[in-house]
């Protein structure tokens, strides 16, 4: 990458991970207000999907051309369905069931082990280079996430296994998105995967007896639309843009920033305490990103 493209790539990922991290705060506020998690997730992504339509139409020269592009094949539909199933429905549903038996912090730590699985599977399925510094960086990043969230994680049980499943579901989606190509543009693919995932989650939610609360305050509507549009449409769209520009391993390494932003946003919005160990976690996250993005000496271009 040129310096300008590299800076744009980093800015895109920082914006995406900030929006991801802030979504935990918005979600926490709404869940504490009594909103069933799966109903909240489902309607969040219905609204988020609809919010992508103007962007898809603008990028592709019309809504029909964006959603049903020329040359569309059943293979494209299958890929969009798979990404929606794994990235929206799979990740969020597994995360919800994990948090029934483990803390939100433990579930978040397990979810954000995603980069290490992307790095390992990316080596197998994508041919991404996995040098020693990158491996060390990924491990340090996992430790940094644990510290940034307060180091709260206990033994491995059923809940932890489900939480790990959410990370693996995200990993599968990342690999599919990077390995395959469709006729859909970035925003059209974002629309379809969020819509498909939302429908699956809502079907499960209503089948299990969950319902939207009878009364919603203006403040809660504000938090819901923030969760649905900037924190979902924005973060997912920027995430796909970044994946298209960089390798899966390098892109996913920046996911370590999302829980750090969640901690910082919680401090300012929810007035949660921020300990010294959490600051140490942030420093380790920064170190991990530097290591994962470093190139071994033999791969660096020779100086002129």
Please identify what each model-predicted range represents:
Residues 30, 40, 44, 98, ...:
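Hydrophobic/aromatic residues within transmembrane alpha-helices
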Residues 76-82, 130-141, 160-163, 184-194:
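Cytoplasmic-side transmembrane-helix entry/capping segments in multi-pass membrane proteins
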Residues 21, 25, 53, 84-89, ...:
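Hydrophobic/small/kink-forming positions within alpha-helical transmembrane segments
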Residues 5-10, 33-42, 70-77, 150-169, ...:
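Juxtamembrane helix-entry segments on the extracytoplasmic side of multipass membrane proteins
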Residues 1-43, 48, 97, 152-179, ...:
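Glycine-/small-residue-enriched transmembrane alpha-helix faces in small-molecule transporters
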Residues 52, 121, 130-150, 167, ...:
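Hydrophobic transmembrane alpha-helices of multi-pass small-molecule transport proteins
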Residues 19, 23-24, 53-111, 147, ...:
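Specific transmembrane alpha-helical segments of multi-pass solute transporters/efflux pumps
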Residues 43, 88, 92, 106-113, ...:
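Helix-helix packing/entry segments at the starts of transmembrane helices
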């Amino acid at each position: 990458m040129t310096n300008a493209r590299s800076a744009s790539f980093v800015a895109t990922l920082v914006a995406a991970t900030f929006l991801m991290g802030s979504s935990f705060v918005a979600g926490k506020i709404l869940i504490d207000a009594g909103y069933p998690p799966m109903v909240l997730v489902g309607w969040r992504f219905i609204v988020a999907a609809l919010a992508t339509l103007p962007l898809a139409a603008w990028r592709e020269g019309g809504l029909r051309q964006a959603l049903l592009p020329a040359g569309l094949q059943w293979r494209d539909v299958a890929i969009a369905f798979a990404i929606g199933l794994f990235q929206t429905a799979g990740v969020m549903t597994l995360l919800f069931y994990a948090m029934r038996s483990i803390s939100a912090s433990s579930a978040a730590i397990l979810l954000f082990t995603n980069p290490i699985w992307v790095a390992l599977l990316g080596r197998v399925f994508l041919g991404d280079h996995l040098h020693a510094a990158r491996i060390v960086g990924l491990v340090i990043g996992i430790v940094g996430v644990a510290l940034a969230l307060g180091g709260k994680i206990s033994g491995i049980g059923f809940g932890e296994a489900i939480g790990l499943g959410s990370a693996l579901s995200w990993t599968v989606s990342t690999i599919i998105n990077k390995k395959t190509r469709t006729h859909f543009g970035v925003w059209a693919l974002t629309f379809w995967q969020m819509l498909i995932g939302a429908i699956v989650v809502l079907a499960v939610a209503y089948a299990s007896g969950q319902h939207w609360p009878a009364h919603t305050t203006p403040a809660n509507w504000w938090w819901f639309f923030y969760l649905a549009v900037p924190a979902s449409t924005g973060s997912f769209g920027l995430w796909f843009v970044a994946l298209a520009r960089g390798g899966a391993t390098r892109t996913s390494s920046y996911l370590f920033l999302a829980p750090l932003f969640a901690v910082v946003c919680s401090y300012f919005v929810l007035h949660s305490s921020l300990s010294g160990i959490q600051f140490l976690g942030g420093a380790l996250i920064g170190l991990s990103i530097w290591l994962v993005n470093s190139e071994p000496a033999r791969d660096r271009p020779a100086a002129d």
